[in-house]
Amino acid sequence: MSESETINVNGPSQDFSYSDSPFCMEASFSSSDLLQSETKNVKRGNESTHTFSEDIYSTEGSLLGDINLGNYPESEQNQPANTRLSSLRQFEPICKFHWIEAFNDEMTVEDLRGAFSYSEKPELPSQVYNDAADGSEKPDPFKEESSVESSISENKDELVPAPVRKSPRSLCLNYYRGEAQPLTEAPFVRSAVVDVGLNISQPQSFLDKENVCKNGDNSSDRENCFEQLDLRAIYKAEEPEVSSKEVQNSGEISELSVSHQEEVTEDGVDSLAITSPWSPAGIFKGSGPQDNSLRPDREVSCEGLEPLEEDMALNEALQKLKQTNKKQELQIQDLHGKNLNLENRVQELQTKVTKQHVLVDIINKLKVNIEELINDKYNVILEKNDINKKLQDLQEASAHTKKHLQESKKDKESLQLQVKKIKVHYVRLQERYIAEIQQKNRSASQCLEIEKTLSKKDEELQRLQRHKGELEKATSSALDLLKREKEIREQEFLSFQEEFQRREKESLKERRKLKSRVEKLVAQVKSLLFTCESERAQTMALQRQVEELKLENLELRQLAAKREAQACTPSFEITQSKEQLEEAVEPDITQETKGTHCNLFLNRSSCKENLELQPLKKTSPLASGIHSLLALRIGLLTCQDLATPDAELCQESKKANDIMLQRLKDCQLKKKDLDKELLKHKNRIATLKELIASEKALQAHTIEITDFDADEVKSARDAPVLLAVKLDKYHSLNEELDVLITKLGGLLESKEDHYSRLIEENDKYRRHVGSLINKVTSYEEIIKCADQRLEISHSQIAHLEERNRHLEDLIRMPREKAKRPRPRLDNHPKSLTLISHLEGHHKECSISL
């Protein structure tokens, strides 16, 4: 399929689903999934489309005349699921006419106004536009084009020429033959299917426009189109079966035609039963004579075979039609673009016109405003003249009034002088009267004030006496409390000093003990190091002894060889003795190397062996060294026993620290109690200060009082002196209390510092004890290493003793063999394997002899 053929195969329209022919059904099955969704949306569309299709059907019935377009109820029965589809099938014959005109290359685009100038319903074009707009609402890739067309048709009342659709002639042929040919038989059939897809992809609005445009054709033209359709259906009978191979093999063409004739004769009845409104049989479904006239033509078309040149010509015609359709589509697109440009220009012109109208309105308004302003100007000028006249009149009146005012001023001044004189006399009389009244009031008020002050002084004296007694009691109680607290604090301080001295003595004792223990441990470590060095010297001496024993063994071997040569012993006894000596020497050498390079951590099985071999060690010359090592071991154990009191001392120090912390907590609680008492004393001192301030205020008030008697003045003078003496006493007491409070605060701070120092010293002692414990643990590890070395040395000594015994036995072997052929060596379990081996070898030798 070429690119030009696939341009419009994007959104299948509903036009293809209207036909019921077999070929159309097969072509529709390939895109059934897409069509189902679209048909559902169509079912949910407006119900107005059904009424619109019925109106168009009525107009079509009036236009077509005598031609029977098919039975509407029957088409409704074929597709009851979709009412809109059944209603739109009434226009299928008109679509057939358009297809026939497309094959004849008679494509014409007519204006709806000219086509329906004689129609009975003038509202049909607007209905067509509405139907096109409804079709544009469906999900279609050509939605934008349909919307543009609808807008152009509404603005300009004209229709854009739509491309004339072609119907593949294979549809008609498939209907007559009653079978669907495969799409892969010939390339022409593929092109026909592509045409069907192109027709499907067109929007429904184009179909409606073409239907409306072609409604005005004459019935004679339609009859000619039907005849041409029948002829082309006859020609098309052989086109789906012709391929590139069949063109070369002409013999196969006749066979294919004969087979098709048989299929037509067999299935003709079924194909006639399945009629669609899009097929020619559907067009003539209602009339019987037309069907009868078609059947002989069909038989003639099946019998005769047309040449291939006509097929080629038809293909060329179809290609030309496709090209013309493409050109028309391009022209339509250009027209769409031009229409859009024109619409934009019209909108611009409309905006310009509206702007001009607005400007004209503004100019008219300005003219009216200018006229109003001119009228206002003339009115203002007239008003100004009137105002000038009124001003002149007012000036004249003001001159007359000024004269009258000057005269009245003179009269007023004379009257004012008289009034002033009268006022002066009245003021003097009033002042005399006020002075007399004030003197009377002063004398009365002074008497009342003197009485009030005397009563107040008596009350204040009584109140001061009460406060004096309360202050004396409070001061005495505060002094007693402070003395008691001072004694308690001194006792606590002495107890703390005693405890501190005791702790210092204990710490000194602990230090001395620890120093002595450390010195003892150092001496023990030195002794252990000395013992280790002595053990090393002993191991060196043992190695020397081993070397000497090796030399002795070599000498013994040489002596044994000489004796064997002299005694002429058999060869197998000599070989046995050599093998025994070699096997005895090799494990001794390996044990020596392992003993010298062994680690410090060994199993304790060697210790058990040492305990079993103690009676043997007494006989050896190294027994004295072993006894000394055991004594060192006992000393180390005693050191470990002495290390246990250190842990007890640590526990005692922890307990003492806990006791100190508890005492510190008690001291803090006591400190809080003292702070509360100090707050109470401060509150009392504040009350005393308030009383003193009130007394000072009374003194100031007494100084202001005047006009007293001599006795009252003396008592008033003596009262502040007495109060001052009392206040001095109170001040002295307060100062003493402040001094005591500061001393107590200093003592508390010093004790807190002392406690913090004690805590720091305790921390230092703990750290020192921890370091000592670490040292003790390190010494214990050193002792363990020394013990392990001792065990290693014991094991080495045991191995050396066993080796010496084994060597002695080996030396005795040749002497005993001469006396006893089978010696028993119960004391050496390792040599049993050698004896069994020697006995077996001896038996073999005896058998061979």
From Swiss-Prot:
The keyword Coiled coil applies. Expressed in spermatids and spermatozoa. Localized to the acrosomal matrix and acrosomal granule. Predominantly expressed during postmeiotic stages of spermatogenesis. Residues 245-259 have a biased composition (Polar residues). Residues 309-568 form a coiled coil. InterPro entries: CAGE1_homolog, CAGE1_N. Pfam families: CAGE1 (PF15066). Keywords: Coiled coil, Phosphoprotein. Residues 125-160, 241-268 are annotated as: Disordered. Residues 135-146 have a biased composition (Basic and acidic residues). This is Cancer-associated gene 1 protein homolog. It comes from Mus musculus.
